Amino acid sequence: VFCTDVSDASGMLLFDVKNRCWSKEMCEICGITEDMLAGIYESYEKVGCVKEDLAKELGLTDHVAVAAGAGDNAAAAVGTGTVGDGRCNISLGTSGTIFISSEKFGVDKHNALHSFAHADGHYHLMGCMLSAASCNKWWNEEILGTKDYAAEQADIKNLGENRVFYLPYLMGERSPHNDPDARAMFIGMSMDTTRADMTQAVLEGVAFGLRDSLEVARSLGIQIARTKICGGGAKSPLWRKIIANVMNLKVDVIESEEGPALGGAMLAAVGCGEYPDVETIAEKLVKVVDTVEPEPELVAKYEERYQKFRTLYPTVKGLF
């Protein structure tokens, strides 16, 4: 079966996201006919069964259903229960995303956020920064020469009081700047700056970068009070605390650490008829095991820091 799902197809300019189909207008402009393109399915729809010869090789029956599935971030959102209206998930992987589900289609006219079809049958807004947990890996492994991230973070004491800023643009930046030439930098060091200050600045810089996308969503009238979190970086209790207070959001930690894989399995379960829809299976399977609450005093400190952070990129942009 030659097919794709709506969440992955949303990344192509040939796709009409609002109507969840190939755009006739864009196809005509590009000289493409729709029969050249993959069939479009909802992420939870059954598209066929495993081929007989492959099923035999794998020791399966020839009636194993195959669902369309979803792109990585959409699948992660399903796996963290970020479905329905007004739910949020932050992913701290190599790159970082803030993913907000919505029952209505909306567009940021400044193109700071992506507007895509979601795997749950609705839509989502997404901000994506190109370097998130990869900033922490680069700092620890390439610069400090260690893989003991926890030991480096153990020396961080005074949250919200660090005088060092870090711009997390190691590979340019997507949301919200859309600038391939943006570059990372540390700003504000002095003779008093410590190794822990620099490590803290990296964690905070990524959190500030994600908040840039959250602020765009807020400017569109979207109000979020809490978020799920996933990805390798989310295993750090300190980073979770920083994000909760930089964003002023409750941060929910879920039981499963395999958001995208779990999301794919959940979509398959809906496709096989085990559950009626994605929202139902998310309510059944996704379990919150911890919640990080923002602390008013720390939120106030980080608010002041963030307002300074957001002036840095426009100021240094001409240097890149």
Regions found by a protein language model. Name each.
Residues V1-T4, A9-C30, E52-F320:
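Active-site core segments that coordinate phosphate-bearing ligands/cofactors
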